[in-house]
Design a protein with these regions (language model features):
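Non-catalytic, solvent-exposed interaction/assembly segments
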Residues: 8-10, 20, 33-43, 48-53, ...
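A short, hydrophobic beta-strand-centered structural micro-motif
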Residues: 60-70, 113-114, 147-153, 162-198
Length: 252
């Protein structure tokens, strides 16, 4: 990424056309949104609160240019879409002053293979009745860098995994993964009992293998809100792991 600027576009802001309407204030609001979007993509979630800023002058000092991509009036509301370009060196200096290391902003495809072990019923669910398979891609955030490809239903794979139910934690999924020709994959095994869900994530990034373990208590998968929160939290864990692979040494 040799470019000297970070460009954030499609920032949409709107405001009612009242007597105190001020276009400049609206553009300033857009600058703040663009800055928040940029740093959310650049840093791991644990550092986000340290580097968020409401200081408009500080944000403006890091902006090179901005463009108005679209403006329109609908129902007495002024709608604005802007693109903002930030000076990369100044952004890096700002993060460095907070002792935070940015990562490359790199979008990437991952095969995501969710396996739900219903321990109460001694059942293994992959495609049907697996709420993680059904809902995984319905939880989105425009700042996510990882794009998930879910497996297509495959009876052969299902039988293979069922056959290895008892040692699923140690099972090597390579035969299944290689069918998809993707460099990166996550096999997530969800161990579900009455009150808790443990998640064992077998992550493979460019031949680097890592296992992560997380647990969620008092979860009801029938509750859409709770289910989506687990999915969002797991996606954040995977986002952070992806960012860890590409930390930029800004001192060079």
């Amino acid at each position: 990424s040799k470019a000297k600027e970070f460009f954030i576009n499609n920032i949409e802001i709107k405001e009612k056309l009242e007597n105190d309407f001020n276009k400049e204030n609206l553009i300033n609001k857009g600058f703040q949104e663009a800055f928040t979007e940029l740093i959310t993509k650049l840093v791991q979630s644990k550092n986000l609160n340290e580097v968020k800023s409401d200081n408009l002058n500080q944000i403006k000092s890091m902006i090179e240019t901005f463009t108005i991509e679209e403006e329109k009036f609908i129902n007495k509301t002024y709608n604005l879409r802007i693109g903002v370009s930030f000076n990369k060196k100044k952004i890096f200096e700002y993060l460095s002053s907070k002792n935070v290391f940015p990562s490359e902003i790199k979008e990437e495809d991952f095969l995501f293979f969710p396996i739900l072990l219903d321990q109460a019923n001694n059942d293994i669910l992959i495609y049907s009745n697996n709420s993680f398979y059904d809902n995984w891609n319905s939880v989105e955030d425009k700042n996510f860098l990882v794009n998930y490809i879910l497996p297509t239903e495959d009876l052969e794979d299902l039988n293979l995994i069922r056959k290895n139910y008892s040692e699923i934690e140690n099972y090597n999924f390579e035969n299944i993964i290689k069918k998809y020709s993707l460099q990166n994959s996550i096999v997530a095994i969800f161990f579900k009992d009455e009150k808790e869900i443990k998640v064992l994530s077998k992550i493979n990034i460019k031949n680097k293998k890592v296992i992560k373990s997380n647990s969620f208590n008092n979860i009801n998968l029938q509750d859409e809100g709770e289910l989506k929160k687990i999915i969002y939290d797991l996606k954040m864990i995977y986002e952070d792991f992806w960012k860890e692979q590409d930390i930029i040494n800004t001192s060079i």
